[in-house]
A protein has these predicted regions:
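Amide-donor transfer/coupling interface in amidating biosynthetic enzymes
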Residues: 2, 35-135
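Cysteine-nucleophile active-site neighborhood
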Residues: 1-52
Length: 135
């Protein structure tokens, strides 16, 4: 990370960028201060865990390089049981609602993370990965 080269964590890769998770006792890498929490959707019987399938995301930081060219709202493919809660809202790049509002994508400095799977997300994912590769 110190080299300044861009880093992109996808799904579990994003989760590892944070501080901690309710899932286990090991700390995360701590590159971005956030925690992972398990979905507790007792008040939403129509919603299942894991959160699986296509969902809309809201781009919060429109000027960030990673989201250039993306439609608003965009749709991405998710498969996860834990969601990110950032300590600093300025680290939230994209948000999503699934019983709770969570950070679907995060960014700080040269470190980027996405909870969804861009490689499974058709034109939206292709645009995001293209933007990342162009820096």
């Amino acid at each position: 990370m110190a080299s300044g080269k861009p880093v992109l964590g996808i799904c579990l890769g994003m989760q590892m960028l944070g501080l901690r998770s309710e899932e286990g006792v090991s700390d995360g890498l701590g590159y971005i201060p956030f925690s992972m929490r398990r979905f507790r959707l007792d008040d939403y019987p129509e919603l299942k865990v894991p959160h699986m399938g296509w969902d809309r995301v809201e781009i919060v930081q429109r000027d960030a390089a990673l989201v250039q060219g993306l439609e608003q709202p965009s749709r991405f493919y998710f498969v996860h049981s834990y969601y990110a809660v950032c300590e600093d809202e300025r680290d939230v790049l994209m948000g999503c609602d699934y019983g709770v509002r969570f950070a679907a994508a995060i960014h700080r400095g040269n470190v980027w993370g996405v909870q969804f799977h861009p490689e499974k997300s058709h034109r939206f994912g292709l645009q995001l990965l293209t933007s990342f590769s162009r820096g």
